[in-house]
Amino acid sequence: MARPQPQPSKTKTHKASDEVQVERLHKGYAQSMEITKVLADEKSKYQHIRIFDTVANGRVMTLDDIVQITSRDESAYADMLTHLPMLEHGKVERVMIVGGGDLSIADEALKHKNVKEVVLVDIDGDVIRLCKKHFGAINAKAFKDKRMTVEVADAFEYLGRKSSKNRFDLIIADRPDPVGPGKALFGETFYDRVKGALKPGGYATFQTGVPFYQPWEITEALQELARFFPKSGLYLSVVPTYIGGFMALSWATKGGNALGTEKGIKKAAKAYKKIKLQCDYYNPAIHAATFALPNWIAKLVP
């Protein structure tokens, strides 16, 4: 079942909240959210974690004051990183999620009955603990699913283990921006390890920034992917609270078909209907359209 989405207040005016969360990820631009209740405010070994309810965006988690997930628009991110490659592949059994401690992506992957194993590897156990407590509407089913394994570990190191070699049909990199502990999840060594952990014919998908404010991420990521994978590319989603409009998602395959071909899109639409997949964002029409790039984004593709 699709998850119920919280709605903003219908009142035209409201009393301003006493506390406001301000995000300043991009130079010269900021977004703010009025907070109604703070649920968690902790500093882990790696980052400052806050979870709070808001007037307009539902429940929100920030890491070092940068929005990571909101209950209102998480599906636009999780659905597209997950279902698009899974439906075009058609036989995904083993999935690894790099990061993703809120388990929103894991929840989507587990909707596919042919999946035998989902392994989520996040370096910050406090993120996992707090998300389990406060984002149950999103992740409660995933935490209870016997196919789900949660590892508190360095995903970069995990990918390099002998036990990870040729293990996964799909690897989803729900990585943060390339700062702090997230730096290791970018660059040639990371992509080489992803390739090594994929089965032949497997796919990987990656968060690749907001092109309006981070255009270089697309060019750099696709250049690096092309060094390790015979086929790779770009597609888009729209996640309102990831400021900047379009969200860039990249893909690569270890010997599989290119994503987004006419044949692949038809295959995915047929599978979507057959398994009666229910999503808040993804559908076959979105799948077909997501590979269309505005000219200014297409110019960023090397």
Regions found by a protein language model. Give the residues of each.
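SAM/dcSAM-binding transferase cores
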Residues: 3-50, 223, 244-302
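The AdoMet/dcAdoMet-binding core of the Class I SAM-like
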Residues: 10-20, 44, 69-203, 213-217, ...
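Glycine-rich, charged/polar anion/phosphate-binding loops
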Residues: 34-37, 47, 156, 233-238
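N-terminal glycine-rich anion-binding loops that anchor highly charged ligand groups
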Residues: 49-59
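Glycine-centered loop/turn positions within well-structured domains
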Residues: 58-59, 157, 257-259
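A general beta-strand register signal
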Residues: 62-63
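C-terminal substrate-binding/active-site "lid" region of AdoMet-derived donor-dependent transferases
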Residues: 182-259
